[in-house]
Amino acid sequence: MAEEFITHSAEETTAWGRELAARLKPPVLVLLSGDLGSGKTTLTKGIVSGLGAAREEDVTSPTFTLLHTYREDEPVFHGDLYRIENFHDFETLGMEDLFSKPGIVILEWSERFPLPLPWPSVRVRLEHLGGDSRRITVI
């Protein structure tokens, strides 16, 4: 059953991410989808900080680097699949290695994920409602 939340600011979206973090148990994939500017990275700031893996201000979009690692001992990865076109791209970037050790993998643009899901997953859809408001749907 889907859960739906409305946030009215970036701070509320980040806070909701911290709440979600408390429910995550590795290994798990957090699959984020939503249009450009819908709040995927803002939500990730809350998740990563809620896990104690990094401070909010240290969490940035991996659009150009494609992957950020926030913790190695209990891995927390944040990837961006926007530029991934096919399995070959995914494989060439070594992204399959994310699943070599149980951890938490947060993927933006998850609709581009080219593999069967190797771990349990939480799907989160973000929608921009105008201004700073977002609809967050968790499946």
Annotate each PLM feature.
Residues K40:
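Conserved lysine of the Walker
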Residues A54-H68:
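Short beta-strand-centered segment that lines the nucleotide-binding/catalytic pocket of NTP-utilizing
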Residues L29-L31:
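Short hydrophobic/aromatic beta-strand immediately N-terminal to the Walker A/P-loop
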Residues S33-D35:
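P-loop (Walker A) phosphate-binding loop of NTP-binding proteins
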Residues M1-W16:
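N-terminal pre-Walker A segment at the start of P-loop NTPase domains
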Residues A21-P27:
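Phosphate-binding P-loop
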Residues E3-E4, E85-I139:
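Short phosphate-coordinating micro-motif centered on Lys-Gly-acidic
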